[in-house]
Amino acid sequence: MNKNFYFILILFIFNGCQPLNFSNKKTTYSKTWDKGAMVSAANPYAVNTAVRILEKGGSATDAAIAAHLVLGLVEPQSSGLGGGGFVLNFDFKTNDLTFIDGRETAPANAKIDMFMKEDGTVMSFMEAVPSGKAVGTPGIVALYETAHKAYGLLPWDALFEDAIDLASNGFIVSPRLAKYVDFAETKGRLTKNPGAKEYFYPNGKKIQK
C-alpha cells in the first residue's frame, strides 16, 4: 500500500511540473558596468578607505590595495606587510579572469629538517613560530606593485594616504585587537618580545578599545 502511494505521489509531482522551454538563443550582456560598487573588509576603517579610493576614480585594485594597507595597521594580528596574498581580477569588458600569486616564499637556506629539534622530535607550533625559522620572504608589497601596474588608475602614493594618516593621528582600537593584545600578554608573548610590547604599550600604557 505504501509503495503504491509513493509511486503515485512521485508520478503526480512529475506530472505537475511545467516542462522546461529550451532555446538556442544566447543571452547577451552589456559591457558597460553601471551598477556601482560594493566593498567588504574586516574593519570599517578599511571599508571607508576603499570607498574613498573608488570615489576618487580609482579602480577596484586601487581600492583593495589601499584597504589592505589600512588593515595592516588596524588589525596587525591578521594582516600586514610581512605576509603575502593573492589577487583575483575579473575584467568585466573582456571577461578575463587573472590570478596573481603573492604568497610568501621559503628562505633560500630552508631545509627539510629545519623544524626538527636536536633530539629528533618536531618543534611544536609555538616553538617554531618565535624561533624565526617559520618566517617566509614576504610577497605582499611585490603583489601590490604587480597588481597596481596592471590594473591601477590612481598614483601609487595615493594608495598609502589613509594608512599614513591613521598611523600618524591614531584610530579607535577594535575589541578584537584589544582581545588579542590581552591574550598575548597573558601568555607571556609580549614579555619575550620587547619591541612588540613597546608597540602595543605606547607610553607604557596598553592600547584600549
Where are the regions that the model predicts?
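Sec-dependent signal peptide recognition
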Residues: 2-9
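C-terminal motif of bacterial Sec signal peptides marking the signal peptidase cleavage site
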Residues: 15-16
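Noncatalytic scaffold domains of N-terminal-nucleophile
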Residues: 19-48, 52, 60-61, 65-209
